[in-house]
Amino acid sequence: SDSMVMVNLKLLIHMVGDMHCPSHIVYTKDFGMPGYSLKIKGKKVGRHKFWDGAPQYMHPKWKADRFVKAYDTYTPKEIKKICKGDAYKWSVQNANNILKTGNYWERGAEFTKFSKEQRKQIDETLHEQLAYGGYRLAATLNKIFSK
């Protein structure tokens, strides 16, 4: 039915997006990731809230079209490689990529005092994860609707 298609589309869009967000990857083992929480202008912000809002924290004046221009930088050949595989492969790849984010800052660090290198690391992760998530969602939707 149409309502079932709508529900499935909403779930697909939500899940593909979430699997590319560093705060939505959960490990069964504690890897000692010290960068769990931080402060933004003195207010404690958890890792989850930070990564969900990272695009706005990093680039508060950007609108959606600016993110597209900045992050949609891969060639068609690279996009094809990025979209290879399935959700399981993508999740494993993301979990491995995201493990490094725990060392971007010390627990309780103040975001406004992050170094250029720390901001660069965060922005590189944003670039990759947002682009990969978008490309993979588009590929999945194209696969579904090309039938």
Annotate the PLM regions.
Residues 1-49, 58, 116-147:
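Soluble secreted/lumenal catalytic domains
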Residues 37-127:
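An amphipathic alpha-helical core segment
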